[in-house]
Amino acid sequence: MAGREIGGGDRRWSLRGMTALVTGGTRGIGYAIVEELANFGAEVYTCSRSQNDLDECLEKWRRKGFKVSGPVCDVSSISQRQTLMESVTSSFNGKLNILINNAGTTIPKEATNFTAEDYSIIMGTNFEASYNLCQLAHPLLKASGNASIVFNSSAAGVIAVPLSSIYAASKGAINQVTKSLACEWAKDSIRVNAVAPWIINTPIIEAACQVPSQKKNIESLIGRAPMKRAGEPSEVSSLVTYLCLPTASYITGQIICVDGGYTVNGFI
């Protein structure tokens, strides 16, 4: 099953021979991204804060014939990010084709209830870590001669959503960095894009729906999207993978919403 190609074996639709780093790759959208990239032939390096999650996923991928490896890493830690990139450098001989900044977190609160610690956690994980990983990965991406960065942003970085002011700010910052790096690093043959999902059926959403009040809020938000349903992780990972394929070679600096039409709905 590993190494799928479409388009009659056209190399524009293959990631065979390419290397990728996906942060937070053992759950939800990150897990789907690792599988999709590996299925198109990429050799993937990923990380997780949980050794148990990592071991379980690596075994599943091994059984599927995917080339996936990686360590435990908390990307909010500067020293752990540096160690991660040293491992990537060693594993991929100093070259990296794909960087997926997927790891992220949120704390839902009213704006007046956020603390300095909340701010540090959300911005540190969602923005600082992603930005710094781009800096650390730049020499490897440039050395590959054909590289792509994709940020996992959010519809919350495009329009206002409840209880998410700091999270939205972190994703809005990601969206602007996407545009800035796309322009600054084009000369190095590095493309930079972002995907901006809305509500996706992940373990986090499933857990939240176990609380009646949260389930009601989530269902209300889902109902505002024209497609009237939550998305699936595979519906995000497919776009992420497309943006990394050679066939997307003229696409850079874009923030693409994967939201069932939520951000463009004028009939709310």
Curated annotation (Swiss-Prot):
NADP(+) binds at residues 21-45. The keyword Magnesium does not apply. It is an enzyme of class 1 (oxidoreductase). Disulfide bonds: none annotated. Keywords: NADP, Oxidoreductase. Substrate binds at residue 154. It comes from the Eukaryota. Transmembrane segments: none annotated. Belongs to the short-chain dehydrogenases/reductases (SDR) family. PANTHER family: NAD(P)-BINDING ROSSMANN-FOLD PROTEIN, TROPINONE REDUCTASE. This is Tropinone reductase homolog. It comes from Datura stramonium.
